[in-house]
Amino acid sequence: MGKHRRNNSNATRKAVAASAVALGATAAIASPAQAAEVVVPGTGISVDIAGIETTPGLNNVPGIDQWIPSLSSQAAPTAYAAVIDAPAAEAQAAPAASTGQAIVDAARTKIGSPYGWGATGPNAFDCSGLTSWAYSQVGKSIPRTSQAQAAQGTPVAYSDLQAGDIVAFYSGATHVGIYSGHGTVIHALNSSTPLSEHSLDYMPFHSAVRF
């Protein structure tokens, strides 16, 4: 009986080693090294194989860490950093985008409100009164007049407009509105036109800024 058990043990070790090779250890095992535990998932069978961790390309085999648990601590730092850092970069960009959209959303609630010279809301607005009011809804303070807004913000190219940017129109930046995305602007034009949303082409473009 003792001899029979030894034969079974040898057969098991050979089967486990063959399974590890089938997962991707196709190259010859490197020079003698510290033995690593190789596990056959779901069987409770394991065996120590010297030098298997040094097999070229072994780390690239999908799921190899389930067979050789010690490899789970050897993940490539660059790949790990890419997975961890990518969401962080997106998270950093999110506040600016959400703030711009919040400005647009605030302005959009006032569509249909009457124009009033010098009015800053909440029931009537002139052009720069609307932009100032919408920005104040997200905690931002900007200059009061259209010319000052156009002069003091960070210049933005027409092709780089984002929701919430302030767009100036006409010579001298005498009129401003809030870029609402998709080529449109929300603005308070004049006493004969209630606060509305129009195409950017509705008026001659002067410049655009971002605060």
From Swiss-Prot:
Native organism: Corynebacterium glutamicum (strain R)
UniProt record similarity statement: Belongs to the peptidase C40 family.
Primary residence: secreted
MF terms (GO), sorted A to Z: cysteine-type peptidase activity
Domain of life where this protein originates: Bacteria
GO cellular component entries: extracellular region
Active site, renumbered: 127 (nucleophile), 175 (proton acceptor), 187
Pfam (any one): NLPC_P60
Taxon lineage: Bacteria, Bacillati, Actinomycetota, Actinomycetes, Mycobacteriales
Biological processes, Gene Ontology terms: proteolysis
PROSITE patterns, A to Z: NLPC_P60
Location in the cell: Secreted
EC class: hydrolase
Cited InterPro entries: NLP_P60_dom (IPR000064), Papain-like_cys_pep_sf (IPR038765), PG_Endopeptidase_C40 (IPR051794)
Signal peptide stretch: 1-35
Domain NlpC/P60: 97-211
EC number: 3.4.-.-
Keywords for this protein: Hydrolase, Protease, Secreted, Signal, Thiol protease
Name under which the protein is recorded: Probable endopeptidase cgR_2070
